[in-house]
């Protein structure tokens, strides 16, 4: 959008910009069905008035807001040129990224269009891609480092994106197999106390990983890949004593590892392998007196070459928008009441705020 002089000079401190939508894009793709995308922009910038006439869009009002509106439409056009449609969620996230850059909350090195058009994996008619700046940086870190920690609240996509990168690496023959693991902490990994076969015992704890796999691969191919050992889904206890070469390894729910388990897992790394460790340090379900390996490892490995820590926040939640506000509300409550994981500090570390 470019600034255009008009006969109606804006008041002092205000500005006006005008934008022409290229002929190859219909106004519906830019404004949304029933002007749904336009309403998102208007709600985000109450200090400006936006007018549409034919294929011309103009904005008048607060100079800062008008400048941001111009950038929003510019970013939208860049996304549309790739053939990717704009959604209300994408517009909201574009606005949030631009405002964060304007307020100095981010360095602005990546634009919304760069974030929203970075495709990781296309499967079953849908494309998996990052939706926030922190998610993009997390995905980029996985490409650039051997060991990456994705730490953040439920719903930030840390496990899902890691699994998409694992499938991408397998399909491009960067690795020969995928290994997915998580601690079965709810049973204390004492699975012998549970009824049923071994598969029946461990399946409830590993089911979220299976669900993600079904989103990314042909469901009919998964049993074949697992039977061949190309994909392995197993409890953390089954990693002991192994060296994992030519593999993309993901440890999920890492906040529920002990320091000893975390060290054991990290030292399974073999040649030509990559490790991604995900977890939420506010959801620790370990028994009394047991430290979280995910908390401790940050103090030990932060700054080590080829190891990266990506931290996501409520702003990166990609579930229902209410989830982000719920995460913030719990964090404020814990801070105000001096609690941790839903219990008084120093108390039992179970009963956290559960969900992923």
Regions found by a protein language model. Give the residues of each.
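N-terminal acidic, proline/glycine-rich, low-complexity intrinsically disordered segments
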Residues: 1-8
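Interdomain "pre-motor" coupling segment immediately N-terminal to P-loop NTPase/helicase cores
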Residues: 50-115
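Conserved helicase motor core of SF1/SF2 NTP-dependent helicases
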Residues: 123-133, 141, 145-251, 255-356
């Amino acid at each position: 959008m470019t600034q255009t002089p008009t006969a109606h000079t804006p008041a002092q401190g205000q500005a006006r910009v005008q934008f022409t939508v290229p002929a190859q894009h219909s106004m519906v793709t830019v404004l949304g069905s029933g002007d749904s995308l336009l309403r998102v922009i208007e709600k985000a910038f109450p200090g400006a008035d936006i007018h549409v006439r034919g294929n011309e869009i103009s904005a008048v009002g607060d100079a800062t807001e008008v400048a941001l509106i111009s950038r929003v439409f510019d970013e939208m056009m860049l996304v549309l040129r790739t053939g990717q449609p704009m959604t209300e969620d994408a517009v909201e996230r574009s606005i949030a990224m631009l405002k964060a850059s304007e307020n100095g909350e981010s360095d602005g090195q990546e634009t919304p269009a760069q974030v929203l058009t970075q495709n990781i994996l296309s499967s079953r008619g849908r494309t998996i891609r990052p939706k926030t700046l922190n998610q993009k940086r997390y995905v980029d870190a996985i490409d650039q480092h051997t060991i990456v920690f994705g730490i953040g609240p439920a719903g930030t996509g840390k496990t899902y994106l890691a699994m998409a990168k694992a499938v991408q690496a397998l399909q491009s023959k960067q690795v020969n197999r995928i290994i997915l693991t998580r601690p079965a902490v709810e049973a204390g990994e004492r699975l012998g106390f549970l009824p049923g076969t071994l598969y029946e015992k461990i399946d409830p704890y590993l089911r979220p990983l299976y669900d993600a796999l079904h989103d990314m691969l042909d469901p009919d191919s998964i049993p074949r890949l697992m039977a061949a050992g190309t994909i392995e889904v197993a409890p953390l206890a089954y990693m002991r004593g192994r060296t994992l070469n030519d593999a993309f390894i993901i440890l999920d729910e890492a906040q529920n590892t002990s320091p000893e388990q975390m060290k054991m897992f990290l030292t399974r790394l073999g040649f030509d392998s990559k490790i991604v460790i995900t977890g939420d340090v506010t959801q620790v379900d370990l028994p009394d007196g047991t430290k979280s390996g995910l908390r401790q490892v940050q103090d030990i490995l932060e700054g080590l070459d080829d190891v990266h820590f990506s931290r996501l926040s409520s702003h990166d939640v990609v579930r229902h928008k209410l989830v982000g506000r719920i995460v913030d509300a719990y964090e404020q409550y814990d801070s105000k009441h001096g609690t941790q994981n839903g219990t008084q500090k120093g108390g039992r570390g179970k009963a956290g705020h559960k969900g992923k």
